[in-house]
């Protein structure tokens, strides 16, 4: 049996969810829109990218860059790219009356080959 914890040993620290951070991910769109009808594929792909960003960054406010939108729609409504490389940036909301303190900006990262790419933290410059 695990040893019992004493009452006053709780870790006090800042939550990592409130940190401003930027990461690059490869999203497999193909598995997320498999079985979706032709006329709903590109719109569904954008919804899935938004859902992925909410899950990874834990902010309900997700903003998609126009270049990412153009990249998803580049081959039309039917032929969405199988994979896409995106940069998710969790940022502070400048708007004071907004209910969310943070938002996520999703930008497109053009790559020629997806082989061997992993999720990486990007330094804020």
From Swiss-Prot:
Disulfide bridges in this chain: none
Keyword Ribonucleoprotein: yes
Any GO molecular function: structural constituent of ribosome
Biological process annotations from GO: cytoplasmic translation
Record's subcellular location: Cytoplasm
One GO CC annotation: cytosolic large ribosomal subunit
Protein family per UniProt: Belongs to the eukaryotic ribosomal protein eL31 family.
Subunit structure as annotated in this protein's UniProt entry: Component of the large ribosomal subunit.
Protein name, entry field: Large ribosomal subunit protein eL31
Species classification: Eukaryota, Metazoa, Chordata, Craniata, Vertebrata
């Amino acid at each position: 049996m695990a040893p019992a914890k004493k009452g006053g040993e709780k870790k006090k620290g800042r939550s990592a969810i409130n940190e401003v951070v930027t990461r690059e991910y490869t999203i497999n769109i193909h598995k997320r829109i498999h079985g979706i009808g032709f006329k709903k594929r590109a719109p569904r792909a954008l919804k899935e990218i938004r859902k992925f960003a909410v899950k990874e960054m834990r902010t309900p406010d997700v903003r998609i860059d126009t270049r990412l939108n153009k990249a998803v729609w580049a081959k039309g409504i039917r032929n969405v790219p199988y994979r896409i490389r995106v940069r998710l940036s969790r940022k502070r909301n400048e708007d004071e009356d907004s209910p969310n303190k943070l938002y996520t900006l999703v930008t497109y990262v053009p790559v020629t080959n997806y082989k061997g790419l992993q999720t990486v933290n990007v330094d804020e410059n």
